């Protein structure tokens, strides 16, 4: 049996190894939750055996050494980390410790914030001008990232307003919105560049570039959450007051900062944020809870590496480790072959996960994945679980190579990969049962034809029994035929028939989207419908004419043109119309006759809106003569940026396109 000294040595060595991978290499091998567990184990052992604590133990410092490639900045006020709690019981124990330690009977008010999952930085302003910026580093010394931070548009180069201190060091988090992260990885996959495991790694990798021009191209943003150095000026005597003051001076502060009067209110805040987490547009891994009063903060003081007056209340881990038992290949509605890892089931963020996407052959090669490997699985919000990385240091001896199929696993047709594309596809078309199933599921989906009650299992049975081959066949179904399906009684069957009848009345945009043309999403379908007005005009359009539509380039135009050039597709459309599918005649909106600031403009919406849904905003803009596109290009006239706007906002700024916020949009809509 190992001695206590040996256990401590092994834990410290393991933690230092993972700190190096995380802080220096930007290539973490294990999830945060596993690191936290190891750190807790070490801290518990050291608490029981304080005589064995060493000065270089990971519990005695904040992080790891800075990268040698950057010059170093010594923090005048150390950048400490926070202690963590992981459940309500631990938070309530922290709350009690704070109450017990305060000598007075003053009420404690809590300032609660989001715990952003990015990179902690300090930014020094002298007489209101940004003069330097640094990473946390080891808490005492960080990396000089001034040139890179100056490229982040959310961070003001000069503060504005009155009573700005002579020297003010603000602290906060640089992070990457989800949309920006997806765009970076999409571009990387297309060009063979580095694909990041998660937005935090992408933010760190973007900020720690030796070439600031690369950082400038990444849609990084920033929220301020604290202060370090303060000279030649005063700040409010509460934490919230300071954040509001920073906001007045032009520093970005999260609008989710909330003052809580009791532990019960803090817990309610925690659960509300946890509920809202999937819709924020950026990654968080918990909430930060701070004593609001600066006087009480001073009274509570610090321990070696963290303040006694604050704690991070972390959410259940979104990353966990497990083993890949097999890799299978699924076929999508456009024939795309997607490898899926079959996993040893593991709970991730409160959900039992047994499958994870591997995207494509390039991703398997990038990961270096073999069947039998130990891997890190990530699940964020509604995102499909994915394999983040392989734990190479724990690779079993009996792993097997993943062999990508040369023939479709469903219909046996050849698999081809077009040059320049990452995705391999089955060439079987609608003779492939898998493609037929997925096409029909898309056709009846809520955002397409919206056939209520026709779920995936019904479609699977209809295809397997060969009752349905094309979307038009759906409208020929009878209650009698449906009653023969598994778990389908006469009443349920009649409900489905009624839903199909109701779905015949649709819109031109929904109909186009339901057809499942490659690269034609909802926004593009709406743009095509608005521009051409009728099916006949769209079918007759040339590739050149199609490219006049906002959001349509040569690739999309070619897909649309080729779809309508295919006789079998035209036949299906004719059958659908013969079965009674219809939509209202187009209402021609002449932008020149509309007195509106949006008339005739191509507008792009990005980020989340708080006062109306995206669909309502789009409809209102179209009524006022705007063309609403799904992506930013040189054709775009205006971008409306909501909360947590990502890569579209960054591209608009890069192209010099006018940008307004939601408040200005609402003002113009009402004018």
UniProtKB/Swiss-Prot annotation:
Domain BRCT: 593-671
Domain of life (superkingdom): Bacteria
Listed GO MF terms: DNA binding; DNA ligase (NAD+) activity; metal ion binding
Keyword presence, Ligase: yes
A single BP term in Gene Ontology: DNA replication
Keyword Lyase part of the UniProt annotation: no
Residues the entry annotates as binding NAD(+): 32-36, 81-82, 113, 136, 173, 290, 314
Protein keywords: DNA damage, DNA repair, DNA replication, Ligase, Magnesium, Manganese, Metal-binding, NAD, Zinc
Catalytic reactions on record: NAD(+) + (deoxyribonucleotide)n-3'-hydroxyl + 5'-phospho-(deoxyribonucleotide)m = (deoxyribonucleotide)n+m + AMP + beta-nicotinamide D-nucleotide
Residues engaged in binding Zn(2+): 408, 411, 426, 432
SUPFAM superfamilies per the UniProt record, alphabetical: BRCT domain, DNA ligase/mRNA capping enzyme, catalytic domain, Nucleic acid-binding proteins, RuvA domain 2-like
Enzyme Commission number: 6.5.1.2
Requisite cofactors: Mg(2+); Mn(2+)
Assigned GO CC terms: cytosol
Catalytic-site annotation from UniProt: 115 (n6-amp-lysine intermediate)
Function, as annotated: DNA ligase that catalyzes the formation of phosphodiester linkages between 5'-phosphoryl and 3'-hydroxyl groups in double-stranded DNA using NAD as a coenzyme and as the energy source for the reaction. It is essential for DNA replication and repair of damaged DNA.
Family note: Belongs to the NAD-dependent DNA ligase family. LigA subfamily.
Name under which the protein is recorded: DNA ligase
Source organism (scientific name): Escherichia coli O9:H4 (strain HS)
Gene: ligA
């Amino acid at each position: 049996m190992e001695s206590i000294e040996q256990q401590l040595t092994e834990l410290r060595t393991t933690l230092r190894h993972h700190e190096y991978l995380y802080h220096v290499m930007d290539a973490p091998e294990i999830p945060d939750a596993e690191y936290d567990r190891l750190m807790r184990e070490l801290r518990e052992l050291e608490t029981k055996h304080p005589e064995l604590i060493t000065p270089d133990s990971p519990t005695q410092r904040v992080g790891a050494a800075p990268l040698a490639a950057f010059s170093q900045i010594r923090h005048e006020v150390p950048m400490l980390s926070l202690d963590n709690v992981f459940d309500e019981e631990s938070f309530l124990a922290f709350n009690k410790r704070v109450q017990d330690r305060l000598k007075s009977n003053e009420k404690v008010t809590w300032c609660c914030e989001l715990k952003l999952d990015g990179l902690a930085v300090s930014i020094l302003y002298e007489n209101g001008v940004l003069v330097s910026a640094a990473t946390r580093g080891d808490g005492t010394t960080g990396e000089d990232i001034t040139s890179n931070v100056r490229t982040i548009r959310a961070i003001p180069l000069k503060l504005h307003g009155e009573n700005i201190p002579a020297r003010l060091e603000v602290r906060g988090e640089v992070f990457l919105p989800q949309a920006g992260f997806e765009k970076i990885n999409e571009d990387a996959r297309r060009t063979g560049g580095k694909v990041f495991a998660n937005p935090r790694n992408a933010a760190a990798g973007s900020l720690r570039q030796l070439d600031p021009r690369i950082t400038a191209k990444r849609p990084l943003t920033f929220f301020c959450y604290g202060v370090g150095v303060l000279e030649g000026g005063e700040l409010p005597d509460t934490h919230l007051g300071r954040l509001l003051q920073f906001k007045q001076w032009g520093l970005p502060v999260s609008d989710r900062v909330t003052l809580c009067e009791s532990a019960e209110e803090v817990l309610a805040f925690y659960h509300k944020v946890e509920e809202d987490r999937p819709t924020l547009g950026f990654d968080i891994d918990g909430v930060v809870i701070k004593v609001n009063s600066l006087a009480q903060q001073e009274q509570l003081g610090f321990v070696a590496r963290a303040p006694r007056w604050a704690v991070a209340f972390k959410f259940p881990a979104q990353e966990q480790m497990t083993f890949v038992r097999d890799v299978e290949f699924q076929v999508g509605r456009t024939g795309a072959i997607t490898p899926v890892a079959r996993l040893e089931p593991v709970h991730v963020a409160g959900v039992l996960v047994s499958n994870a996407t591997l995207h494509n052959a390039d991703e398997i090669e990038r990961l270096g994945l073999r069947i039998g490997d130990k891997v890190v699985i990530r699940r964020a919000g509604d995102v499909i679980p994915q394999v983040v990385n392989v734990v190479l240091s724990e690779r079993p001896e009996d792993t097997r190579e993943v062999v990508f199929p040369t023939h479709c696993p469903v219909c046996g047709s050849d698999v081809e990969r077009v040059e320049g594309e990452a995705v391999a596809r089955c060439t079987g078309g609608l003779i492939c049962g898998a493609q037929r199933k997925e096409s029909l599921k898309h056709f009846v989906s809520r955002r397409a034809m919206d056939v209520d009650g026709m779920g995936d299992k019904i479609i699977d049975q209809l295809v397997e029994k060969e009752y349905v081959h094309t979307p038009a066949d759906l409208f020929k179904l009878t209650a009698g035929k449906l009653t023969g399906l598994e778990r389908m009684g006469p009443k349920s069957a009649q409900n489905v028939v009624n839903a199909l009848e109701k779905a015949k009345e649709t819109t031109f945009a929904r109909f186009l989207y339901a057809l499942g043309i490659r690269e034609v999403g909802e926004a593009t379908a709406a743009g095509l419908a608005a521009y051409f007005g009728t099916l006949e005009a769209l079918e007759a359009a040339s590739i050149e004419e199609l490219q006049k539509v906002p959001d349509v380039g040569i690739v999309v135009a070619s897909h649309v043109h080729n779809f309508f050039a295919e006789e079998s597709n035209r036949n299906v459309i004719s059958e659908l119309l013969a079965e009674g599918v219809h939509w209202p005649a187009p209402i021609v909106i002449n932008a020149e006759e509309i007195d509106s600031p949006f008339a005739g403009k191509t507008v792009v919406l990005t980020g989340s809106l708080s006062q109306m849904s995206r669909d309502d905003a789009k409809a209102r803009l179209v009524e006022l003569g705007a063309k609403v596109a799904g992506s930013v290009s040189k054709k775009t006239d205006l971008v409306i940026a909501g909360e947590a706007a990502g890569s579209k906002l960054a591209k608009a700024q890069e192209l010099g396109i006018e940008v307004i916020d939601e408040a200005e949009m609402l003002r113009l809509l009402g004018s």
